[in-house]
């Protein structure tokens, strides 16, 4: 069960009592997340008029880009800023220029040179320590660790230029 930090009293006490009264099992775990803040550190709120409409962002950039930003850049437990400028920076550096370039390079080499990987090579077994972050709901920490590896791979490909050596 997730709740905002301003709602912990209700979720951890009153809601649990309501569940018990309805003979429904209590929550075993309550994950308390921070606020998403806007310009000036003000908490985003529809009722206060301090939020962006995520549908507008999804229409312009795609829902996956918005999901990427929210999972990678928004801290699971602390307040995190969201501005259109910060979103655009993350979109351009992370998706368009980062993973976009890396995916293009790797897929081109894999297709042109018939690179095949085994199921074991494609598994997440190398990330057993990082997967613990997911078990503790620290999603952005998990993604940032994997993102660091992807960035390292992209830098390695740029530096060694394996596509030139295969020709």
Language-model-detected regions and their locations in the chain:
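Helix-rich, typically C-terminal accessory recognition domains appended to large enzymatic cores
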Residues: 88-122, 126-167
């Amino acid at each position: 069960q997730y709740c905002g930090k301003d709602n912990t009293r209700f979720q951890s006490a009153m809601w649990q009592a309501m569940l018990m009264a309805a003979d429904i099992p209590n929550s075993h775990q309550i994950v308390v997340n921070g606020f998403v803040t806007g310009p000036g550190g003000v908490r985003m709120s529809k009722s206060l008029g301090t939020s962006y409409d995520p549908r507008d962002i999804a229409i312009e950039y795609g829902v996956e880009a918005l999901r990427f930003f929210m999972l990678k850049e928004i801290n699971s437990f602390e307040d995190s800023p969201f501005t259109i400028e910060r979103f655009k920076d993350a979109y351009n550096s992370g998706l368009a220029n980062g993973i976009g370039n890396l995916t293009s390079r790797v897929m081109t080499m894999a297709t042109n040179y018939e690179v095949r990987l085994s199921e074991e090579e494609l598994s997440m077994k190398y990330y057993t320590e990082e997967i613990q972050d997911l078990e503790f709901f620290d999603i952005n920490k998990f993604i940032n660790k994997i993102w660091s590896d992807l960035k390292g791979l992209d830098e390695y490909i740029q530096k060694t230029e394996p596509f030139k050596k295969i020709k």
